[in-house]
C-alpha cells in the first residue's frame, strides 16, 4: 500500500542558471548545494570538468560520481533502466557525436560504481517514488526530453520558449533533446509537478504529472533520476 503524503510540498532551493549549452546537469547539482558548496564548484568550472573526467559532456553517472567525490556527506541514489550506454543511441542524432568519446568512460563508471560507493538501482522509478521522495527527503534531478516538457506558466508552450536554440543542451534540433531539471515540489490534488529549469533565470515551472512522465520516460533519457536528500529546514520555504 502506498503511503499517505502531503498535498503540497515545495523545497526552497537556490536557482542556478546554466552558463553554456551543455551544463544543465551540473547546474541542477548546484541547485542542490548550499552557498559554500556551490562556490567550491563554480570557482573554476573548466578545471572541475577536467578533474572529474567528463569535460563538456556530462552523463547522469558523471553527476553521481562528482557528488560522491566532492560531497560525500550528501545522501543520494540513482535509478536508471540502462546500466551503461544503450547501443541503440548510435542512430540518434543527439547522441551520435558524443558516443564515440564517452562510451568507454560511461561503461567503466557503471562497472565500478559499487566500489566507488555510487548507489545505482536498475529499474524504472514510478511517479509515486518521486513524489514520496520530494514529500519526505529532498529533490530529484531528472533527465527529460525537453521537446516534450511543457510548462503551464511560461510565455510559450516550451520551457525553452523563444530561446530553445540557445538554451537547449548541445544546441541541436532533434526529436530527442536531453535536458536536466530539478523536481522540487508538487501539488497532489491538482496533479502538478513543480520544477526548476536551469535554462531559465530564477523561476519555478509547473506541469502536469502526465506531461512530466512523458518527458522523463521518453526514449533517450534511460529514465534517469537522482534522488537527493536535503536539509529538512529547506522544506516548504
Give the location of each predicted region.
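Noncatalytic regulatory segments and standalone regulatory/sensor domains
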Residues: 1, 134-141, 145-237
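A generic short-segment signal for beta-strand/edge and adjacent turn/coil regions
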Residues: 43-46, 108-113, 143, 193-197
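Helix N-cap and loop-to-helix transition residues
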Residues: 24, 41-42, 59, 126-127, ...
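Short, well-structured alpha-helical interface segments that form or flank functional binding sites
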Residues: 19, 58, 62, 125, ...
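Active-site nucleophile-adjacent alpha helix/oxyanion-hole segment immediately C-terminal to the catalytic cysteine
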Residues: 1-84, 132-136
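Predominantly the structural core of cysteine protease catalytic domains
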Residues: 63-64, 68-175, 226
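Generic detector of short, locally flexible boundary/turn motifs and exposed helical patches
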Residues: 5-9, 39-42, 104-109, 155-162, ...
Amino acid at each position: 500500500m502506498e503511503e499517505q503524503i502531503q498535498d503540497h510540498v515545495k523545497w526552497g532551493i537556490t536557482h542556478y542558471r546554466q552558463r553554456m549549452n551543455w551544463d544543465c546537469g551540473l547546474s541542477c547539482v548546484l541547485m542542490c548545494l548550499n552557498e559554500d558548496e556551490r562556490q567550491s564548484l563554480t570557482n573554476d568550472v573548466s578545471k572541475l570538468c577536467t578533474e572529474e573526467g567528463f569535460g563538456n559532456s556530462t552523463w547522469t553517472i558523471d553527476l553521481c560520481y562528482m557528488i560522491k567525490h566532492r560531497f560525500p556527506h550528501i545522501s543520494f541514489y540513482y535509478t536508471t533502466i540502462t546500466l551503461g550506454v544503450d547501443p541503440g543511441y548510435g542512430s540518434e542524432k543527439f547522441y551520435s557525436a558524443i558516443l564515440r568519446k564517452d562510451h568507454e568512460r560511461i561503461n567503466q563508471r557503471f562497472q565500478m560504481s559499487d566500489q566507488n560507493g555510487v548507489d545505482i538501482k536498475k529499474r524504472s522509478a514510478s511517479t509515486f517514488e518521486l513524489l514520496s521522495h520530494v514529500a519526505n527527503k529532498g529533490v530529484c534531478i531528472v533527465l527529460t526530453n525537453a521537446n516534450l516538457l511543457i510548462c503551464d506558466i511560461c510565455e510559450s508552450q516550451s520551457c525553452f520558449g523563444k530561446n530553445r536554440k540557445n538554451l537547449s543542451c548541445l544546441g541541436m534540433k532533434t526529436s530527442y533533446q536531453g535536458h536536466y531539471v530539478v523536481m522540487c515540489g508538487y501539488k497532489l490534488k491538482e496533479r502538478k509537478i513543480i520544477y526548476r529549469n536551469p535554462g531559465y533565470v530564477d523561476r519555478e515551472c509547473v506541469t502536469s504529472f502526465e506531461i512530466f512522465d512523458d518527458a522523463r520516460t521518453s526514449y533517450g533519457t534511460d529514465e534517469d533520476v537522482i534522488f537527493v536528500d536535503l536539509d529538512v529546514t529547506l522544506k516548504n520555504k
